[in-house]
Amino acid sequence: MDDVIVVTSDYVPGHRIVKILGVTWGLTVRSRGLGGNLVAGLRTIAGGEIKEYVTLLNDARETALQRLISSAKAMGATAVINMRFDTSDMAQAMTEIVAYGTAVVTEPVENSQNVTLS
């Protein structure tokens, strides 16, 4: 079991859930730093996207997601269903990002129809 399937739905297409293992999550707390806050403050005056924060949050979400996958693997999961992200500010210069979902064990269903989104 090398890969854990992660989906935002309550099922995994082409698979049957055979066991629910419970809640799994991965989180990270990131500091925006003084320099980032100064640049962001200047950008808010001019308007537009604050690229420093976009990069920070994208990196933090990826870290939280990888930690969720590691946690699910440690539980013996083959998939995580209903995965969500949640973000909250802590103090003035820190942001917490958590990825969470339900760790499950799945097995492939023979002759299943693949879901195609258009």
From Swiss-Prot:
Entry-linked InterPro entries: UPF0145_dom_sf, UPF0145_YbjQ-like
Gene3D superfamilies: Hypothetical protein apc22750. Chain B
Family, per entry: Belongs to the UPF0145 family.
PANTHER family cross-referenced by the UniProt entry: UPF0145 PROTEIN SCO3412, UPF0145 PROTEIN YBJQ
Protein name (Swiss-Prot/TrEMBL): UPF0145 protein PTO0347
